[in-house]
Amino acid sequence: MSLIHPDTAKYPFKFEPFLRQEYSFSLDPDRPICEFYNSREGPKSCPRGPLCPKKHVLPIFQNKIVCRHWLRGLCKKNDQCEYLHEYNLRKMPECVFFSKNGYCTQSPDCQYLHIDPASKIPKCENYEMGFCPLGSSCPRRHIKKVFCQRYMTGFCPLGKDECDMEHPQFIIPDEGSKLRIKRDDEINTRKMDEEKERRLNAIINGEV
């Protein structure tokens, strides 16, 4: 014990239970999980209820992003909060400023996620099947993938789920999307008709 860091544990206050219950005051975030708490029955499943010193984890607790209010010390929901009370960089909320402007004034010290806008563009279904007629002007995303040589030659022992390369799916095109290749005689006939029409127009206009 010292004047700079006095030992205050032996001086309890009557309002401490209220602070722990309402604001999780002085509760260790790394405290163990309560073995009596049942997420289906709620706080009543634990004999100590909201006064329990251990953590009551909800089933949706680990599947959400980090709570914005908790990051600032302003969340009042405690363990009942539907967002994550944990500093996890992979589950941080998206930076609103970066998503709107394409840059962040707090970078590289920003605590929120900077998500590439291109990753939000939906995939092009035509490109996924093998060919997109719009090419580079397509508004959807074209993701380049390397085809599995073993699959292309007939068989891949790893299968689609475990193979790191792409296994293209053979899709039979619709009748309306089939390409028709003209014969040479059809092409030559069209050229002859165009030549005749050009000569006729020249005669009419007095160019010959």
From Swiss-Prot:
Subcellular location: Nucleus
Keywords: Metal-binding, mRNA processing, Nucleus, Repeat, RNA-binding, Zinc, Zinc-finger
Coarse class of the protein's main subcellular location: nucleus
Biological process per Gene Ontology, one example term: termination of RNA polymerase II transcription, poly(A)-coupled
Zinc finger (C3H1-type): 28-59, 61-88, 89-117, 118-145, 147-170
UniProt-listed PROSITE patterns: ZF_C3H1
Family under the similarity heading: Belongs to the CPSF4/YTH1 family.
Assembly and interaction partners: Component of the cleavage and polyadenylation factor (CPF) complex, which is composed of at least PTI1, SYC1, SSU72, GLC7, MPE1, REF2, PFS2, PTA1, YSH1/BRR5, SWD2, CFT2/YDH1, YTH1, CFT1/YHH1, FIP1 and PAP1. Interacts with FIP1 and YSH1.
Record's miscellaneous remark: Present with 3690 molecules/cell in log phase SD medium.
Protein name: mRNA 3'-end-processing protein YTH1
Organism in which the protein naturally occurs: Saccharomyces cerevisiae (strain ATCC 204508 / S288c) (Baker's yeast)
